Amino acid sequence: MRTTFDCIVVGGGHAGCEASMALARLGQKVLLITGNVDRIGHLSCNPAVGGIAKGHIVREIDALGGMMGLWADKAGIQFRTLNRSKGPAVRATRAQVDRDLYMQAVKQDIFSQPNLSVWQDTVEAIIVKDGHTGGVKTALGQLFNSQYVILTTGTFLSGLMHIGQKNFSGGRLGDVGTSKLSSSLHSIGLHLGRLKTGTTPRLLKTSIDFTSMEMQLGDTPIPSFSFHGPKPSQPQVPCYITWTNEYTHDVIRSGMDRSPMFTGVITGTGARYCPSIEDKVARFADRDRHQIFVEPEGLTSQECYINGISTSLPLDIQLALIATIPGLENAHMVRPGYAIEYDYVDPMQLHPTLETKVLPGLWLAGQINGTSGYEEAAGQGLWAALNVFCKITRQEPFILGRDNAYLAVLVDDLVTQGTKEPYRMFTSRAEYRLLLREANADIRLTPLGRKIGLVGDYQWNLFQKKISDIDTLVNRLQNIRIKPDTLDPSIFLELGESIPNRAYTLEELLKRPSITFQTLRKIYSDLPITSEDVYLETETIIKYAGYLDRQEELVQRSAKLEHSYLPKEIDYTKVAGLSSEVIEKLQIVRPQTLGQAGRISGVTPAAITCLEIYLKKIHAFR
C-alpha cells in the first residue's frame, strides 16, 4: 500500500473532491482520505447547486477547468435562471439536483481518475517535520506522508448535533466526526472558533398534498452551468411553494423553552442569511407567514426537502408545526431537522493562497474556513489545489484580484477580514460585479485555467471559437448600417421606441433599452448564426459599454494600491503615524498589498497614507 503522496486531501465533500480531482488531473499523486466512502460528494443539506452569486462561483470553477458544473449538469432535475428580469450582473443559474445522481457522478470521476487514491479513515493528527507539514496520522494507525495537506473537514471538526434538548456528536446525521484533529490543529498554533448550521426535516413524498401548493417549473430552454460539458439530459420536475401561518408560529413559540438555540445550549454562531424557522419567527414577529419550497430529493427518491424550515426544535414540535402547513397536514416525517455546531479556523490565519501562516504545507478549504455553501467550499478546494500545484512546481502563487472573480472576493474577504459567522457569497460583496458576470466567467478565467494546465483541448477550442464568434458579431454590428426608409415602423412602435430618422448601425440600434437580438433579426435577417451564449454576451457588451468602461476605470484607479506590495517582514511599530489599534490589526492579517491593507476593518485611509510614505522611504533608501 502506497504511503507517500504529492498531496493528501482530507475530506470527501465538495472542497475535497474539487481539490483532489484538480491535483490528480495536473499529474500529482493524490490521496483522498474520507470518513465514509459511500458519502463522497454528498449534498448534506439542500439538494441544489447554484443561486445568486453561488451560480457565478460554479461557472468560475468550470471556466478554470473544475468539476462542479459538470456534476450539477449531469444530475440536475430542474434549472432556473434567477433575476432574469434584472441586470446581467445579478443573473444566476440555480439547479435542483438529484442527490443520488450527483453523488454517482462525483464518485464515478473520483474512482476513475488516474493519480488519485481513496482511503476510508479518520484523520486525527497533522504530522509536523522540521517546522513543515509532513503528513497525517489516522484513527486506524496509518501514517501517510506528504509535504502538502489540504484539510476540507466541513462540519466534522468536533461536530455536535442538536434536536431539542438531545445532542450527540458526529459530523452529519449518520456519520461520525473527529475531535482529535481539532486538538492537533490547536497544538500547531491555530485559533479555533465555533459555528452552527442546520437542516430541515425530510418528508415522505407520497404523504404530501401538492394540489394545495403553487407549482414552480424550471426554465425552457434549460440553462446549464458548464461552458463545455454535455447539456442537462435528466427529466425535469417541478418544485412547489407553500407558506407557514399563524398556527405554525404559535406551535413554534410553544417550543421555544426547549429550543437549544434559545436556551443557550448552542453556543456556535449561526448563518445570518439562512436562519432557522424558530429564529425567523422570533426575529420577524410582525410577519404572519414565511415562504417554504418543497423540493424533490431526486427522480426516484421518496423524500422531499422542505426548504425554509431548518430547525433544531424538539421532535414533537417539529411534527406539530409541519401539520399546520397547507399541503403538509398529513405528511410523514422521514428524517428530523437538526442543528450542528462545529469547529472552524479563523481564516485570518491563512495566506491568500489558503495555506496556513503557522505551518507551511498545510492548506484549509471550505467550511473549516468559516464559509457556508457547497459552491463556496468547492471554489476554495480548487483555489487551494491550484496553489499547492504552483508550490510543488515552483510557479508563482495562483492569486486573482477582486476584479477577476468571485472566488477572489471570497478568499480576500476571508483572509483580510475574517468571519465570526458562516460566510455566504452575495453579488453585493463584489465591488466590480458588472465585470464578474456569470456569463463571462470563461472569458475572465479560462485562459488562466489553460495556462496552469487544467483546461483541456476540447474546452479550450470551444472557448476560442466563442471569442472569435463574439468578435465577428460585434464587427458586423458596427459596420452594417440600416437606412430609415428600409425599416418597418411597427417594430419600434410595439416596443415604445422612437422610429429612426437617420441611418443607424445595428450596434447603435442594439444599444436601445428595448431592442434585443430577437428584434434585430426582424430588422436585418442576415445576422451571423451563432450560439445563444454569444448573442447574449455580445448584447451585454454593447448595451452596457458605458457602465463596463466606468468599472474598468475604477479597477485601474485601485490597481496602484493592489500592486504596492508590503515587505513580508515589515515591523508596523516602525511606521510613523499608525495607531496601536491599526498596528495590531496589520500584525494579525499581515496584508500583502496596500489594497488588501485598506480592506481590513479599522484601517483608515490615513493609515494607508502612512504606509505609502513608509514604502516610498524604504524604496528610496534601497
Curated annotation (Swiss-Prot):
Domain of life: Bacteria
GO molecular function, a single term: flavin adenine dinucleotide binding
Cofactor section: FAD
Entry annotated with the keyword Lipid metabolism: no
Main location as per UniProt: cytoplasm
GO biological-process terms attached to the record: tRNA methylation; tRNA wobble uridine modification
Binding site for NAD(+): 270-284
Keyword Flavoprotein: yes
Location of this chain's protein in the cell: Cytoplasm
Alphabetized Gene3D superfamilies for the sequence: FAD/NAD(P)-binding domain, GidA associated domain, C-terminal subdomain, tRNA uridine 5-carboxymethylaminomethyl modification enzyme MnmG/GidA
PROSITE patterns reported for this sequence: GIDA_1
Quaternary organization: Homodimer. Heterotetramer of two MnmE and two MnmG subunits.
Role, per record: NAD-binding protein involved in the addition of a carboxymethylaminomethyl (cmnm) group at the wobble position (U34) of certain tRNAs, forming tRNA-cmnm(5)s(2)U34.
Name this polypeptide is given: tRNA uridine 5-carboxymethylaminomethyl modification enzyme MnmG
Lineage of origin: Bacteria, Pseudomonadati, Thermodesulfobacteriota, Desulfovibrionia, Desulfovibrionales
